[in-house]
Amino acid sequence: MRSETLRRAASLLVVLAAVALVGCGHSAPPANAELKAAIADLEKAVVAAKAEVQRLKDVDDLENLAGIYGHYVDKNRHDDVADLFARDGVVEIYGRGAFLGQDRVREYMHNLSPGSVGPRDGSLFNHMHLQTVIDVQPDGRTAFVRSRPFIMFGIVNANAQWGVGGYENVFVKEDGVWKLGYLHGYYTMYTNYEDGWTKKATPIFGEYARLPPDRKPTVQYAAYPAAFVPPFHYKNPVSGRADHYGDPTFHDSQKQ
């Protein structure tokens, strides 16, 4: 759907540009005030259409980048994951704390499976990104992306787990390329496969003893059966109200 919208916007841009050029290049006598105003309106429309085409392209790029992150991290491609981050990027996953800068992000990712890179026989690790909400900011260099991960994890003949949560991520355009600026993952429910969430719930994970964070967790919360909703970066698009759990200054506080 986004690709079709992008094509239509591009077509509109071509039409508007052509009309504007015809008006500007007409060999008739000097344009009167009405024609000048019409040409000015067309020029504004071309500028607006160009901005909308760029925004739609940014949305497509961001959706792809979020999905690519998921594919890489699931298969232990730690360096590929770290390469998706900005130079001063940050990763913060549940209670592990925050790791600042691309080098520390890389260290954190390798710590997820020490001594192992790439998919492993007998190991399952998938988390799908669902319900993605993408908001490109007016500056065209910052974007907020919210999604819901559905997690499947297991070791054959050993154990299996599943879980859900939420991502509230900040993306930045660095050197003309969208990158992860702040990856913030909240896991709100974890349980083993056999018992399920009706019988058992795993407490939120804490800091790694072997890899202390650069900063304590930004948000303190308890996982299921406690009720916690990650703060929304956006207001209700119809009413304009901020959600009860949301905070309009949420991302500003994370950047400090």
What label would you give each PLM region?
Residues 149-153, 171-173, 187:
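Beta-strand elements of well-folded, non-transmembrane domains
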